């Protein structure tokens, strides 16, 4: 929204206005906000020349601090969700998240949850109320970009598209003294401390052990008016009331962790003090009618409950591998050290902290009125005042140095000018009415501009800004204060992340939300009527509780080319959401993938610099010396293609990673017994060493061989012991906007996937939220029963094996579940429900019996699955549940698919499809379905026992499938089945033309489950290369298709008993093997039509082509016996066609590159973004505005969006044509239209570039791709010649 206090549009101040600090979680940043016309009511963002290339980037991202109009006034807010994301970003936040706005309350929150987020809108959480609202991006103004160390970013104003890693951030905060109307600015985030020494979710070091806090007990030290001191637990403290309530808690303690702070004034009845522990002074008389007024002196943690993760190398410690007790009592808390060296990067809007007055500040006398304004409108006007006060300095800085970045030191102001600043601020805000344009007077602006800025690097202390307040306004707000204080619903209450396992999105803590007794309300009114100003002298060293009201972030970034740029304003950066696996940064540890490279596994590389456009890296190769105390350089620095190197499997270190010491230090010095051994990575050096900040804040530089990164273990063990803690999370906390999630047995389970739900004992799981409406078919209900029974059957046999070692309680539950499921097995849905058949429509508020029935079945399934996971003694051969293709013992030899020229031995259509061995059926398209006598021994599912419970029904289904395959196979698909195992199939799919997969063959093993078609078939992709050549085809064999239940799908995309094997094959051919496979990755489709998406898609195609050639080389050398004849026939012509086509592209690129270098300095075509003007104008006819229609991948958030048998037709659709949306706001100037998307990837190429249209984005070819593809083509040529497939002249 337009800031009424903003200066004239000519002043570029808004771009520099401070904003909230970044989140603890590395969050993507936002692109710049366009600047609408001054008269409009929309956000005034940076001017057009400061924006990104028009139509090339997003506007806002999660965790950005924005300002906009809410309930009639300007408010600050945090972006919590952007279009294309799955769930609220606060679901990822850890313990020390936002306090002031961590819980949404009221209608805004509910509406945000219920309605999907439309394109062009973001979900904003307004400060300080915490209400969430969907707001159009163009109506918001970006105040501060959230970046934290290790974030990958790009520079928004540069034409260079290389990315960089944030190595440090500096955050200047404006903080408000809690309970007052005084603002201190600037305060560096490093000068702010946490109110509580430990919080939920903290990682801690305890001697040699690393652990994570999952619960804690707190107490507060209170001081009475007579000087007596006592300690009270926070449960009793929650019964007291705040004399100066905060607007976001409306007089209610919203959480133990954030509800108390030093200096807080509380009041409550004497009976609450009956169980406190008196520490000093005279204990008062506790009469029933008396009330005590106390001041919080200190907040303390008295007990920690910890999940222990791992033990580090401990030379002076014990050899015991037993972890410490899970409960750490107060006497041992001194041995606990928090891993918090990056706390300063995590300050954000609404967070409460402690601020210690520095010694360099003269003693300050601050006057304020208490209680602070306690209504939304009052707080909203505060946002205007803060922005106005801070903007003055920004304008002065920029007028002095318009061409340079705002230095972090420039924003300081001399304390001598404090009075002048305060006077001006009071004059500006004295009247409740504001001028329409909100601009300051010309005299003020001129005076501010005339002030001399301080020299760069001059450190000055913060100064105090007092919000001006008019007495009339204050009087008028009293009633509103009382109404807000009386409010006891969730509208303005806030629940901190500390009481919730999903950190700050639950409605937990309701037991602490006490209504205010009438006597207390009256007392508050009396207190307000006094209107006396309270004064307090602050001396250096005094600690005060403050709340962050806005921040200004600057970052130090190391770019891919090795250069380091400091003090970049975070608003000038935007995050790289989807980082290519082949992007490497200086300091990354890598290994060589080239066949001819040194086979010594001890040799590893360290990236010195990278060429983003050329896709190459300069790498130094190192090897550990035999002494083990240092490394030696092997050879010279080498320019290597990014496609020829991979991340080191063991040395993966990034800034902020938690590491433990696992070996001796390199200098061989004697070990100290208390030498720290748990810490965080501060920096990865190009010299092949890692700088670590240990838990005691000491720093050392250490070899990677002596460190172990435990990030992967943390992800697995985060909540291993959380069952013991009290979550308090409400059921709606686990809701999400997605559609479904896959289960191990292929059944699509809940309508709402859960958000990282911690393991809970089987019978204590939270009840899933009830859907407002549900439509359930008989097939779906039957499938649920049959799926659960199928899962239970193999587990029944495990009971005997588990014996005494298995947990008895779990097995008792398992037996009960199996009994129930067996009893349900042969009943129809109608019998189970004892009512009428399911109706297509259901009352929104009343869940049907069908829904409850399915929920019960799903719960049983989940319990069984969890129990199965706990039993690790089952032999693989005995498993009859869903096969896990990842653990197959002998991987089949290289196999692959087939094409249209496959021979058909006997063109006979199958009448019965009982199928005799050796008989081949040719479909109308000329493709082949045949029946072989024996299944090969290396078939992925050969070892899975096949015993269908209803054999007659199963074989009838198989015959129908075979008849369909024999008559309807489309061009490019071949299927074989086996007489001895009618449940097994093998399939070959030929890569479609005009895609990176053209002339390639892709092989799949298939099994029909015992209860097919109630559940989908099992597919295993037989990968021929290391790494994925498609987002949906994993090298471990997993195939991600919604029809298989391995990915999210809707409607006809989900498997039903009427679906067929043919549908799945068509979906793979038409929706997986596509021309831009990059967008198949979940969530990436939202990048379609944007510059970043085009770049990533082009680079992905380079990688896919290289892996296709590598895979085909393996197929030629080791063809699987099932399709050996077909593979040889295909590659005798198709192999050389693939070679010649790629070589022609290399020649074309070389010719065009020479031609483009000739004209008058015309730069050669590259993949870097075009300048803003070119991007805006060159393809104006091909751009479409976008603000409301569904995205191409919106129907399915997963990797595919197939529609059953229509898959082939939908495969040929033009994805990019679906990005049309409504026109943007008329008030926005045309030069900064937001987020236009281009129809075709061809529009990103320079005009008249001459690049051929090959069907998918590949040109211009990168230097790294050319290096790698030439190497793999040489190997492919050799393989073809070795296999006796000489090149024919006509092939060329």
Curated annotation (Swiss-Prot):
Record's keyword terms, sorted: ATP-binding, Coiled coil, Cytoplasm, Nucleotide-binding, Nucleus, Phosphoprotein, Transferase, Transport, Ubl conjugation, Ubl conjugation pathway
Modified residues (Phosphoserine): 50, 87, 89, 399, 401, 441, 515, 836, 839, 896
Tissue: Predominantly expressed in skeletal muscle and heart.
GO biological process: positive regulation of BMP signaling pathway; protein K63-linked ubiquitination; protein monoubiquitination; retrograde transport, endosome to Golgi
GO CC, any one term: nuclear body
Feature: compositional bias, Basic and acidic residues: 406-427, 882-893
Active site (catalytic residues): 1040
Compartment(s): Cytoplasm; Nucleus
Record field: compositional bias (Pro residues): 1-37
Catalytic activity entry: S-ubiquitinyl-[E1 ubiquitin-activating enzyme]-L-cysteine + [acceptor protein]-L-lysine = [E1 ubiquitin-activating enzyme]-L-cysteine + N(6)-monoubiquitinyl-[acceptor protein]-L-lysine
Disulfide bridges in this chain: none
Name used for this protein in its record: (E3-independent) E2 ubiquitin-conjugating enzyme
Biological source species: Homo sapiens (Human)
Lineage start: Eukaryota, Metazoa, Chordata, Craniata, Vertebrata
């Amino acid at each position: 929204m337009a800031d009424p206090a903003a200066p004239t549009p000519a002043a570029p101040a808004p771009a520099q206005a401070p904003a909230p600090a970044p989140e603890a979680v590395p969050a993507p940043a936002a692109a710049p906000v366009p600047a609408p016309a001054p008269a409009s009511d929309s956000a005034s963002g940076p001017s057009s020349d400061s924006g990104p290339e028009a139509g090339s980037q997003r506007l806002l991202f999660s965790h950005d601090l924005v300002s906009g109009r809410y309930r009639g006034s300007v408010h600050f807010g945090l972006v919590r969700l952007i279009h294309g994301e799955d769930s609220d970003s606060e679901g990822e936040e850890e313990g020390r998240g936002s306090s002031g706005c961590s819980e949404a309350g009221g209608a805004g929150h509910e509406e945000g949850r219920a309605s999907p987020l439309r394109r062009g809108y973001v979900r904003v959480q307004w400060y300080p109320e915490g209400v969430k609202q969907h707001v159009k991006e163009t109506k918001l103004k970006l105040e501060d970009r959230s970046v934290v160390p290790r974030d990958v970013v790009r520079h928004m104003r540069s034409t260079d598209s290389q990315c960089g890693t944030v190595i440090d951030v500096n955050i200047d905060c404006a903080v408000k003294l809690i309970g007052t109307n005084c603002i201190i600015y600037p305060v560096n985030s490093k000068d702010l401390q946490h109110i509580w020494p430990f919080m939920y979710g903290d990682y801690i070091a305890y001697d040699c052990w690393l652990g994570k806090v999952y619960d804690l007990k707190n107490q507060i030290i209170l001081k009475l008016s007579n000087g007596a001191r006592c300690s009270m637990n926070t449960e009793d403290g929650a019964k007291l009331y705040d004399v100066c309530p905060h607007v976001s808690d409306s007089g209610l303690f919203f959480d133990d962790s954030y509800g108390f702070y030093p200096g807080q004034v509380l009041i409550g009845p004497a009976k609450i003090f009956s169980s406190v522990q008196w520490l000093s002074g005279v204990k008062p008389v506790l009469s029933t009618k008396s009330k005590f007024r106390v001041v919080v002196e200190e907040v303390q943690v008295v007990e920690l409950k910890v999940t222990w993760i791992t033990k580090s190398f401990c030379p002076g410690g014990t050899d015991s591998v037993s972890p410490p007790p899970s409960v750490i009592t107060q006497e041992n808390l001194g041995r606990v050290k928090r891993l918090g060296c990056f706390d300063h990067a995590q300050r954000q809007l609404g967070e409460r902290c402690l601020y210690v007055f520095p010694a360099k500040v003269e003693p300050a006398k601050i006057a304020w009125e208490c209680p602070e304004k306690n209504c939304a409108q009052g707080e909203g006007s505060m946002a205007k005042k803060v922005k106005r006060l801070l903007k003055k300095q920004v304008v002065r800085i920029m007028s002095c140095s318009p061409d340079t970045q705002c230095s972090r030191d420039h924003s300081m102001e001399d304390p001598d000018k404090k009075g002048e600043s305060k006077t001006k601020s009071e004059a500006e805000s004295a009247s409740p009415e504001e001028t329409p344009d909100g601009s300051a007077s010309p005299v003020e602006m001129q005076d501010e501009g005339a002030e001399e800025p301080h020299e760069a690097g001059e450190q000055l202390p913060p100064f105090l800004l007092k919000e001006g307040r008019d007495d009339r306004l204050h009087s008028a707000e009293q009633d509103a204060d009382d109404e807000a204080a009386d409010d006891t619903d969730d509208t303005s209450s806030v629940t901190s992340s500390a009481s919730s396992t999903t950190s700050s999105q639950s409605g937990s803590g309701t037991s602490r939300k006490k209504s205010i007794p009438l006597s207390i309300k009256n007392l508050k009114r009396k207190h307000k009527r006094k209107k006396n100003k309270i004064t307090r002298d602050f001396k250096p060293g005094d600690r005060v509780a403050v709340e962050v009201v806005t921040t200004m972030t600057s970052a130090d970034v190391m770019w891919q080319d090795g250069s380091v740029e400091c003090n970049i304003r975070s608003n000038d950066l935007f995050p790289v959401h989807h980082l290519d696996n082949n992007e490497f940064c200086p300091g990354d540890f890598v290994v060589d993938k080239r066949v001819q490279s040194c086979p010594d596994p001890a040799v590893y590389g360290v990236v010195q610099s990278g060429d983003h456009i050329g896709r190459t890296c300069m790498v130094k190769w190192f090897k550990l010396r035999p002494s083990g105390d240092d490394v030696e350089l092997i050879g010279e620095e080498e320019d290597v293609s990014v496609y020829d190197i991979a991340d080191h499997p063991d040395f993966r270190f990034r800034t902020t990673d938690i590491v433990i010491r696992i070996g001796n230090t390199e200098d061989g010095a004697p070990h100290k017994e208390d030498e720290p051994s748990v810490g965080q990575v501060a920096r990865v050096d190009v010299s092949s060493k890692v700088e670590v900040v240990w838990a005691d804040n000491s720093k050392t530089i250490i070899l990677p061989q002596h460190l172990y990164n435990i990030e992967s273990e943390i992800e697995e063990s985060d909540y291993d012991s959380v069952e013991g803690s009290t979550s308090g999370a409400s059921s709606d906390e686990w809701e999400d906007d997605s559609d479904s999630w896959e289960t191990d047995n292929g059944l699509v389970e809940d309508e709402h996937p859960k958000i990282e739900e911690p393991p809970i004992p089987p019978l204590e799981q939270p009840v899933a939220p009830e859907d407002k409406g549900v439509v359930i078919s008989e097939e779906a209900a039957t499938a649920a029963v049959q799926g659960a029974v199928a899962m239970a059957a193999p587990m029944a046999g495990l009971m005997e094996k588990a014996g005494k070692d298995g947990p008895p309680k779990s097995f008792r539950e398992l037996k009960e579940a199996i009994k129930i499921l067996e009893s349900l097995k042969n009943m129809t849905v109608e019998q189970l429900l004892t009512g009428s058949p399911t109706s297509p429509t259901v009352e929104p508020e009343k869940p049907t019996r069908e829904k409850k029935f399915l929920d019960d079945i799903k719960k049983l399934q989940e319990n069984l699955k969890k129990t199965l996971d706990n039993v690790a003694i089952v032999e693989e051969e005995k498993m009859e549940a869903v096969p896990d293709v990842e653990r197959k013992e002998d991987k089949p030899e290289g196999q692959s698919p087939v094409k249209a020229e496959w021979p058909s031995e006997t063109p006979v259509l199958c009448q019965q499809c009982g199928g005799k061995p050796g008989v081949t059926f040719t479909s109308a398209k000329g493709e082949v379905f045949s029946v072989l006598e024996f299944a090969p021994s290396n078939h992925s599912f050969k070892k899975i026992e096949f015993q269908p419970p209803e054999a007659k029904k199963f074989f009838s289904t198989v015959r129908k499938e075979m008849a369909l395959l024999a008559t309807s196979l489309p061009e490019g698909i071949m299927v074989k089945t086996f007489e001895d195992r009618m449940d097994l199939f093998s399939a070959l799919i030929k890569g479609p033309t005009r895609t990176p997969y053209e002339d390639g063959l892709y092989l799949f093993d298939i099994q029909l489950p015992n209860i097919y078609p109630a559940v989908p078939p099992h597919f295993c992709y037989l990968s021929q290369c290391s790494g994925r050549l498609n987002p949906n085809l994993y090298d471990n064999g997993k195939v991600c298709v919604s029809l298989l239940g391995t990915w999210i799908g809707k409607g006809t995309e989900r498997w039903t008993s009427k679906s067929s094997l043919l549908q799945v094959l068509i979906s793979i051919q038409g929706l997986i093997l596509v021309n831009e496979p990059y967008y198949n990755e979940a969530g990436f489709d939202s990048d379609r039509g944007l510059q970043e998406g085009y770049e990533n898609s082009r680079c992905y195609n380079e990688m896919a082509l290289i892996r296709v050639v590598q895979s085909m080389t393996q197929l030629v050398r080791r063809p699987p016996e099932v399709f050996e004849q077909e593979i040889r026939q295909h590659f005798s012509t198709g192999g050389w066609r693939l070679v010649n086509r790629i070589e022609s592209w290399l020649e074309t690129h070389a010719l065009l590159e020479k031609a483009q270098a000739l004209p008058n300095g015309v730069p050669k075509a590259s993949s870097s973004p075009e300048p803003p003007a070119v991007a805006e104008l060159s393809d104006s006819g091909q751009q479409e505005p976008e603000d409301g229609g569904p995205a191409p991948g919106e129907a399915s958030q997963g990797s595919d969006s197939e529609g059953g048998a229509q898959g082939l037709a939908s495969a040929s659709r033009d994805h990019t044509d679906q990005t049309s949306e409504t026109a943007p706001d008329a008030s926005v100037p045309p030069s900064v239209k937001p987020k236009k998307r281009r129809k075709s990837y061809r529009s990103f190429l320079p005009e008249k570039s001459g690049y051929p249209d090959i069907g998918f984005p590949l040109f211009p070819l990168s230097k790294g791709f050319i290096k790698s593809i030439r190497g793999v083509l040489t190997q492919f040529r050799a393989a073809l010649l070795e296999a006796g497939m000489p090149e024919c002249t006509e092939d060329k």
